[in-house]
Amino acid sequence: MLYPQEFDVIVVGGGHAGTEAALAAARMGCRTLLLSHNIETLGQMSCNPSIGGIGKGHLVKEVDALGGAMALATDIGGIQFRILNSSKGPAVRATRAQADRILYKAAIRDMLENQPNLWLFQQAVDDLMVEGDRVVGAVTQVGVRFRSRTVVLTAGTFLDGKIHVGLNNYAAGRAGDPPAVSLSSRLKELQLPQGRLKTGTPPRLDGRSIDFSQCEEQPGDGMPGGVNEGVLPVFSFIGNAAMHPRQMPCWITHTNERTHDIIRSGFDRSPMFTGKIEGVGPRYCPSVEDKINRFADKESHQIFLEPEGLTTNEFYPNGISTSLPFDIQYELVRSMKGLENAHILRPGYAIEYDYFDPRSLKSSFETRQIQGLFFAGQINGTTGYEEAAAQGLFAGLNAALQCRGQEAWLPRRDEAYLGVLVDDLITKGVTEPYRMFTSRAEFRLQLREDNADMRLTEAGRAMGLVDDARWDAFSRKRDAVSRETERLKSTWVNPRIVTPEESERVLGKSIEREYNLFDLLRRPDVGYGKLMSLNEGRYASADVQPDVLGDLSASVVEQVEIAAKYAGYIDRQKDEVQRAAHFENLRLPAELDYMQVPALSFEVRQSLQKHRPETLGQASRMSGVTPAAISLLMVHLKKGGFRGFAPDVTDAKGEEASA
């Protein structure tokens, strides 16, 4: 049957990528259909019950700045919040939250069901409708055909998924869900470059069988015994601590030599070591057997016992992801302190799945081979909820822009971690599941969690992603930061007015000349609050107080203080960005035949011809493309007179002629 309604965007898959893609396209006014094999699993946290972390939290904040759902859902479902690297500089500080699986999923479902322009339909997709080199819709397993102008594919681990526990394996998309075998076969028919990856999950434990008195308690920030007691972190720029449910601690135990011996005794039945698993696993989230094998000299590994929610006894033992046989899982769990009598509710497993080489994507995440078909999430070779959500939003907004007949949007590497993520995938590809870290961003000083809204919300508003309520909150914050920064720069402190004792109390030493407040705030040990107490609050402003700005007050003060203290470093990084921008703005000709550039090595020519980077900047970051190769390519392009590369026109005196 051909469904009578036609859509602008069809999103296949309802995980973290799919939900953000569908919400983004619908917010932009496109008629959007979200197809999922099971509506009950929309927004499901398939692995660990947590959101955020180093690099990952930055992505969540950026998704939020563009109007996305993940941060708000985490504020509604978060049962523990922590600021990681809180003692370090603001560029590497990151928010991490434990989430109640049920509350998180319910929050996502609520947003989906109440989003205008968005329709849900429960059916697995078996086929894509393709006419010529363009996708025109999707076909479900019972033969319902939906026509659309674009399709966003966010299939997660479902494409030809296979679960492994010991030497036993079976087809599945995740535990309890069927795989997408037909869709995987169809994509292979389209001759898209494909490979296999794997990921894993630990056995889940019954909290009633855990002896927590033998474990170390780990309270969250704002909890009794935690950092900043009474002050709970918030993930969304429009969230607040009142949204959070009851907070819970995590617990810590450790593996030991006996645990390691038990794990080694199962190596001969491990699918990873016996060659049953072909896919490559995530380097930064290895299975426990991989850790014991690779780090044989380590006597123990930390294991975090994370609560799955407020209404369940289930715990997630973070650190023992495994595909070992169940009898080994049973023994290794019970060998650890506090877990001697632990009951396993669900066995751990590894899952293998298809992914497609992201180097075959355009910078909009549209496939090069099939027009209108976009990929996002684990299908692109990434791992993690946060990476998936960011890609989903990105693919969804670009599908919507294509439907509008507008140019694709891509933030630069100096504008967003999202830009770093996309650029890394389409230029370097993946050899293992890709995870975001702050170290992947060369301009991370200006890509902080705290300023994600300042970097992206205006762009989101221009595209139609940001609603009025978010825009109003952002505008108030932006204007307050600007006003307060200007006030500090124009307010002067005279040593004749401030006594040496008062100056020493606030500034650490007396001042000998006049300073403005902004310059005084640049001093390492002078905080905003302390500075405003100078001369009994003479220099404080009522405009940034909580009774005027409400929840925005703290973030405004934070922005002003960071701008002052890191001004020199930020200015230096802006200069670096300017120098790097030259290559980013040079677009490579679409018609260029790289095989006809004789100065380049055959390997470089082959790589450029196959992956066809869009800019010289992208080409410079491709694997195997050296700075020397880029110089030779520029010489070729200038000699050929290609647009943007032609030599400058000069007059007889050697000066640039005016147009």
Curated annotation (Swiss-Prot):
Keyword terms, alphabetized: Cytoplasm, FAD, Flavoprotein, NAD, tRNA processing
Gene: mnmG
Annotated HAMAP family: MnmG_GidA
Organism of derivation: Delftia acidovorans (strain DSM 14801 / SPH-1)
Molecular functions (GO terms): flavin adenine dinucleotide binding
Cofactor: FAD
Entry annotated with the keyword Transmembrane: no
SUPFAM superfamilies, sorted: FAD/NAD(P)-binding domain
Protein name per UniProt: tRNA uridine 5-carboxymethylaminomethyl modification enzyme MnmG
